Amino acid sequence: MSPSETLSRLLRERQAELRLPSVSAAVTAAGKVVWEEAVGIADAETGVAPTPNTQYRVGSITKTFTAAAVMALRDEGKLGLDDLLSAHVREAEGSPLTLGRMLAHNSGIQREVPGDVWVKLEFPQTPDELVARLAEAEQVLEPGTHWHYSNLAFAALGEVVSRVSGGAAQEFVEERFLRPLGLARTSWLREEPAARGYYVDPFSDVLHAEAEVEHSGAAAPAGELWSTPADLCRWADFLAGREAMHAVQVMVDAEHWTLAWGLGLMLHRRSERVLFGHDGAMPGFIASFAYDRTERRGAAVVANASTPALGVTAIALDLVEAALEVYPAEPELWRPAAQPPAELEGVLGRWWSEGMEFTFRWRGRLEAVPEGPARITEPAVFEQEAPDRYRTVAGRERGELLFLHRDNAGAVAELRWATYRFTRKPEVVSAS
């Protein structure tokens, strides 16, 4: 079978297995959407079939946009992850919540906005109403002690974005992400063509139309967006480069874990492969995306059914694995590089520290690769800060300094990396 036939078969099998009225999916490889397909019924009343351009509500995937907005303001120095919520929403004075814990779902605040929001589908429509509901919320767990998912926390983070940026959080997301990235089919309100949401009777194949939530008001940053799989794939490609959002905040079982959290992102483990993403659900809709940063392969899946989002998350993960098979990475050709900087003369080659051998090399940048059993780790990467002074910016000992020590003739005699001494030959550690 061709790559598209393989992916199409997988999608159609899962649609039948999960009894989804319709399902739409896309796959991205090396920054390009390489496959997309939609099957089923987008609108049961009219019998209209979906296309890859059909919008679906993506629910909590919206949180990844809100998290990216918070991180963008952090990068600009306008807020910090250790800031208390009250530093930006003064009405929250006395609250123990910090922005970082809210992003990672370990703030301990209750899950939902106080009230009957999921019974009456009535959400706080104004910032004042949201802040008033926040004051009624219960601190159900001690901050930082347990993972506890909270839509309320992300609604409050949206208010932080609004106050810090000086405009609505929705406008900030549009200006910073949707328009620059060309996510033309991602919007806060439904834009036709769009699917209708359904509940599938568990004991028959009858569809029931779900109540529509047109606008969730001040809670929108927690789950309002509509989108398409192709747009979500482009979004995942963008997020893959935002290193700070991938820092794991909670890890209960380091050996056997299969699901963890970064800052606004879910982390999935399948065998030795780690993928990031997020899922989402609103009445009548489920959605998920998953992305392998190492291989630059990702997938997004949306459907119009009220059923656990785990089903479409499994489809997305399966599509990524299938994409790795049918769209293998192209081998990167070797090309000669420019001469290394003169300062690095005498640095490149093999060095030893405490019985461990490292190769320092130039690959358009200074790198250090451990030899022997430790070679499986990523190379350390250095950037020059001053003459004979480098900062480790990636890999082993990230953040630590590397100094070049020279002899009286000006030749590099030894290195000091993270205060450890490196010599050209193995030497016994000495206090002299």
Language-model segments: which ranges?
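Short, conserved catalytic-motif segment at the N-terminal edge
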Residues: 2-58, 78-83, 87, 135-137
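Short loop/turn microsegments at loop-to-beta-strand junctions
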Residues: 21-23, 56, 168, 286-287, ...
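Short, surface-exposed loop or secondary-structure junction motifs
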Residues: 32, 39, 43, 95-283, ...
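A short acidic/small-residue loop/turn micro-motif
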Residues: 41-44, 306-308, 420-421
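Short, glycine/proline-biased beta-turn/loop segments that scaffold the active-site neighborhood
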Residues: 81-94, 181
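Short, well-ordered beta-strand elements
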Residues: 288-291, 295-305, 413-417
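Peripheral terminal and inter-domain segments
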Residues: 310, 314-432
